[in-house]
Amino acid sequence: MASISQTNQFPCKTLSQNPPHNQFTSKPSILPLNSVRISRSLAKKSFLSIQGFTRARPLVLTRAADDDEWGPEKEKEGGGALAVAEEESPKEVTEIDNLKKALVDSFYGTDRGLNATSETRAEIVELITQLEAKNPTPAPTEALTLLNAKWILVYTSFSGLFPLLSRGTLPLARVEEISQTIDSENFTVQNSIQFAGPLATTSISTNAKFEVRSPKRVQIKFEEGVIGTPQVTDSLVLPENVEFLGQKIDLSPFKGILSSVQDTASSVAKTISSQPPLKFSISNSNAQSWLLTTYLDEDLRISRADAGSVFVFIKEGSPLLMP
């Protein structure tokens, strides 16, 4: 709506009286009287007051131009923009969001729990307990669509995994990823560990079936083990030079030798990678366990095993996995 000071800029038309005559006369205005919403009584009163004077005060009728940039149309557009801004307001951060962030931050430097100090473990246990008390999915086995995903292990207190996580167990190899893939339609679980070395990567996994035993608990029976086919690196990158005892050694003469070695390595890599994975059955009747899901939402899962060990998983692709 235009301010009073801005009305001086609006196009106006002046109705003035002819001095020689006492009777009120005016030229036809480009703006009809009713276009500025002046009532008949007001117009009549103005006319009578003018008749009593030889020189009447001019009656000024104003009307805002149609192209007023502050007019109703602009206000309408502004209101729409405000509505859009309200719809795009950021999601409110809840107490659960803060607990999840604090829990994930506490995993930093622990190598999935292997290097966690007693103080850090106590902090993690406290955060897990608080999250379990606020579990948004009290019956996880009745929400199988949430369970149906690939879950990345980010922390565990299961000591049986620590020798595997230790670098001394497998020289020149490191654990790249530990995951659990749940297929709720076929009631299957696949536990997988991926290893990475300087020249190859491989994986070891177990396939199992699960049965729902309670709103939080499932029984798992392992059926098959799989050793993945090693994916051999078929290319080696040789630097231009290396520094040894304070001197730079030029390695360009060795590039010709490396090229012939790479051709052989590429052929070997293709041969090995084309082989099928090695599978073996698990027929031991004791190869089973149960799993209790104590917290579950769209990107975080906390489970406890039969020995009381805790496992914290984050769904693959979740923003929580980003550093």
Swiss-Prot record:
Location(s), subcellular = Plastid, Chloroplast
Alphabetized UniProt keyword annotations: Chloroplast, Plastid, Transit peptide
Instruction: Identify the GO cellular component terms for this protein.
Output: chloroplast
Q: Locate the region Disordered.
A: 1-28, 66-88
Q: Where is the transit peptide?
A: 1-63
Q: In which tissues is it expressed?
A: Constitutively expressed in flowers, leaves, and fruits.
Pfam families in alphabetical order? PAP_fibrillin
What InterPro entries does the entry give? PAP (IPR039633), PAP/fibrillin_dom (IPR006843)
Question: Where are the coiled-coil regions?
Answer: none
Instruction: Identify the main location.
Output: plastid
Chain ranges passing through the membrane: none
State the similarity comment: Belongs to the PAP/fibrillin family.
Name of the protein described by the UniProt record = Plastid-lipid-associated protein, chloroplastic
Species whose genome carries this gene:
Citrus unshiu (Satsuma mandarin)
